[in-house]
């Protein structure tokens, strides 16, 4: 059984890494452990549990900046920014349902280390693009800082970009600063019904190339569409999200519907059902470990959007799948 170290502050983290280095012990760095079921099991001697490093240390809504300890719950952070009518623009996925964990079990450090991003990535980027600053401990047991507490900083080489997506293999982050942005006033989703995968990806490509500022583009084949929140369709459904102030969303929806009429039947979802749908897509709810799919293996495949349908032909027909990121992400 792997031993666990649970530091109380950044100095404890530094001491733990220095000890592991001196004793030639391999460390597994975890925030709240919500993503440990991903990939193959790590071959480590000691777990460095950072959940004790918790709490928001700075939040300036007017400056669009938030700083928190690495082990701070994402639920706490999202509730705080929502109270100021703001959001995390990279729309971090909650892996909990997919991996058999409770909802909201992830930490800020885990979201950054995994470079999480939801459906809005095609418009706003991933966690890396909203990561402003960090304090961390290197593999040599040395504390270092990178970035700062401002949206635009010129503090030298941007190590933040390297740490995002490193899964804790390059450093143990202790304090993190991220960018927040205003929450959209409303949203609607345009739905195309009955398209096959090839035509759906063409339609999504046309929508993304338009001036409609689409913030989510997904295709849900008929065998799985009915399992997504907000939908009652038994047909293949191609979903295109529009966000912003109400008059703009209304105008862009009308423009997008006119653009896509030639692809077939077009309808739309209002704000409430749209939010439910995109939350379900973001968290891959139909594949939840405690859902109908059970504990089956789940693959996450990134590809060129235009090649998504071609790749899908190589997947066994017995497998369930859907597309996000305009065809560039296949679950």
Describe every region a protein language model picked out.
Residues 1-27, 50-102, 112, 116-149, ...:
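N-terminal glycine-rich flavin-associated loop
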Residues 15, 75-77, 197-202, 246-254, ...:
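Short, conserved charged micro-motifs
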Residues 26, 213-218, 318-322:
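A short linear hydrophobic-aromatic micro-motif
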Residues 29-35:
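Glycine-rich beta-strand-to-loop/alpha-helix junction loops that act as flexible
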Residues 36-42, 229-231:
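Short glycine-biased active-site loop of nucleotidyltransferases that positions the nucleotide triphosphate
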Residues 43, 233-235, 323-329:
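Short Gly/Ser/Thr- and Asp/Glu-enriched loop/turn motifs at secondary-structure junctions
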Residues 113, 132-288:
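C-terminal substrate-binding/cap subdomain adjacent to the FAD-binding core in PCMH-type
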Residues 281-331:
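Substrate-recognition/cap regions that form aromatic- and gly/pro-loop-enriched pockets
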